[in-house]
Amino acid sequence: MANKKRSASSSRWLQEHFSDKYVQQAKKKGFRSRAWFKLEEIQQSDNIFKPGMTVVDLGAAPGGWSQYVVQQLGNKGRIIACDLLPMDPIVGVDFLQGDFRDELVLKALLDRVGDNKVQVVMSDMAPNMSGTPAVDIPRSMYLVELALDMCRDVLAPGGSFIVKVFQGEGFDEYLGQIRSLFTKVKVRKPDASRSRSREVYIVATGRKL
């Protein structure tokens, strides 16, 4: 019965995925994922990315966010990206493949950032979902806590943080942590985010000194 349930759920997800207008548009326009449209909407609302910035992209593969941001930064901008999964090269993106939770990978990522602070940290990280919120939410919260730690390490005063978070236990406390570190915090649900998904995007600007 469980296998049949999973099979039905998987079939429904595939049907929804391939009929999704954002998936179709991404494929038609040569974008790497529908996440491109989520970040475009955030940029239109919050004007985060500007030419010449340095940006850290966590959970970068397959590259939809990096692909969008590299267009906003111009030739003098820089993106340092990391993901457990491989990602095809993008001009202007320094990609590190590895598990962000691993201390050696984190050190390698910090080495690539160097001594200069960055203007934006963005995270689209998510755990492998089991379909059980009691399991998935804590795993997700662990990842977003690590992303916030990255902000504390490398984000310049006045910098911005964009992070995907799944609503559930721990969300309000996490939002409170972000509000203590930034002057302006918004919770966004882009049109390209599926309505039945728990995911939202916290957009925080003006990192406090």
Curated annotation (Swiss-Prot):
**Which key words tag this protein in UniProt?**
Cytoplasm, Methyltransferase, rRNA processing, S-adenosyl-L-methionine, Transferase
What GO molecular function terms would the record report?
Answer: rRNA (uridine-2'-O-)-methyltransferase activity
- Its EC number is 2.1.1.166
Q: What is its main location?
A: cytoplasm
Annotated catalysed reactions: uridine(2552) in 23S rRNA + S-adenosyl-L-methionine = 2'-O-methyluridine(2552) in 23S rRNA + S-adenosyl-L-homocysteine + H(+)
* Binding sites annotated in the UniProt record for S-adenosyl-L-methionine: 63, 65, 83, 99, 124
Record has Cell membrane as a keyword: no
rRNA processing recorded as keyword: yes
**A cellular component annotation (GO) from this entry:** cytoplasm
Subcellular localization = Cytoplasm
User: Where does the record place the catalytic residues?
Assistant: 164 (proton acceptor)
Highest taxon, organism lineage: Bacteria
Matching InterPro entries: RNA_methyltr_RlmE (IPR050082), RNA_MeTrfase_FtsJ_dom (IPR002877), rRNA-MeTfrase_E (IPR015507), rRNA_MeTrfase_gammaproteobac (IPR004512), SAM-dependent_MTases_sf (IPR029063)
Q: Which Pfam families does the entry mention?
A: FtsJ (PF01728)
Function of the molecule: Specifically methylates the uridine in position 2552 of 23S rRNA at the 2'-O position of the ribose in the fully assembled 50S ribosomal subunit.
| HAMAP family membership | RNA_methyltr_E
Q: Which NCBIfam families does the UniProt entry name for this protein?
A: PRK11188.1 (NF008390), rrmJ (TIGR00438)
Which family does the similarity line name? Belongs to the class I-like SAM-binding methyltransferase superfamily. RNA methyltransferase RlmE family.
By what name is this protein known? Ribosomal RNA large subunit methyltransferase E
Taxonomic source organism: Proteus mirabilis (strain HI4320)
